């Protein structure tokens, strides 16, 4: 019941965001999006740390390299200095592109979390995955509104294919692949958060070095 109440409140907040965002300025929209992306990255970091505490040493050796993340082919700025050189339209398109790429993987993580092996706090993990989905949806809705305000040059978007339909058959593979996907998401949520913070700085005319 508590979970349903929390989900209802967030859903209502999203509806209010969608309705009210059409009437407010771009800088305020940037601020709201930045707050949501910050929460998204904070949640993914917390969840990754939870998994780390239950991850066997051998699993770290067996876990795929970051270059195996399904979004690794997307060319993005590597740091803040590079992001500051990218146009506003391109940055918001990259943020939306990355966010959209995680719709299916987050569904997979949500379905696997309740029966994840070797993790006594499955309920907490499942709850945080659902929160990630909620905040991802909320942020995506906000970015769509921002794009409409910024013009047609920001509106093209396609999805990055995700081919991982399952996490494996044995317990070790499932845990390793779950942890790997979460590590990839944490990396991408950091990128999204960084891009939106740069956009927020530009919208409020802050000096680049303070972004």
From Swiss-Prot:
Lineage: Eukaryota, Metazoa, Chordata, Craniata, Vertebrata
Cellular localisation: Secreted
Family: Belongs to the somatotropin/prolactin family.
MF (Gene Ontology): hormone activity; prolactin receptor binding; superoxide-generating NADPH oxidase activator activity
Signal peptide coordinates: 1-23
GO terms for cellular component: extracellular space
SUPFAM superfamilies: 4-helical cytokines
Example GO biological process: positive regulation of gene expression
Keywords, in A-Z order: Disulfide bond, Hormone, Secreted, Signal
Chain ranges passing through the membrane: none
Disulphide linkage map: 69-184, 201-211
Protein name: Prolactin-1
């Amino acid at each position: 019941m508590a979970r349903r109440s929390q989900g209802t409140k967030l859903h209502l907040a999203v509806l209010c965001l969608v309705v009210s965002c059409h009437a407010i300025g771009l800088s305020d929209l940037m601020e709201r999006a930045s707050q949501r992306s910050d929460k998204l990255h904070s949640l993914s970091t917390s969840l990754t740390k939870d998994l780390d505490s239950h991850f066997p040493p051998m699993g770290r050796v067996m876990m795929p390299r970051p270059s195996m993340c399904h979004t690794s082919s997307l060319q993005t700025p590597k740091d803040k200095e590079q992001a500051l050189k990218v146009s506003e339209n391109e940055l918001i398109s990259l943020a939306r592109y990355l966010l959209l790429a995680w719709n299916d993987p987050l569904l997979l993580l949500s379905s696997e979390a309740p029966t994840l092996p070797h993790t006594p706090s499955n309920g907490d993990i499942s709850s945080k995955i659902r929160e990630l989905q909620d905040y991802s949806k909320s942020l995506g809705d906000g970015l769509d509104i921002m794009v409409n305000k910024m013009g047609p040059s920001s509106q093209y978007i396609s999805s990055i294919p995700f081919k991982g339909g399952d996490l494996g058959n044995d317990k070790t593979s499932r845990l390793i692949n779950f942890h790997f996907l979460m590590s990839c998401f944490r990396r991408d949520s950091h990128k999204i958060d960084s891009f939106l913070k740069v956009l927020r700085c530009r919208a409020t005319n802050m000096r680049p070095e303070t972004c």
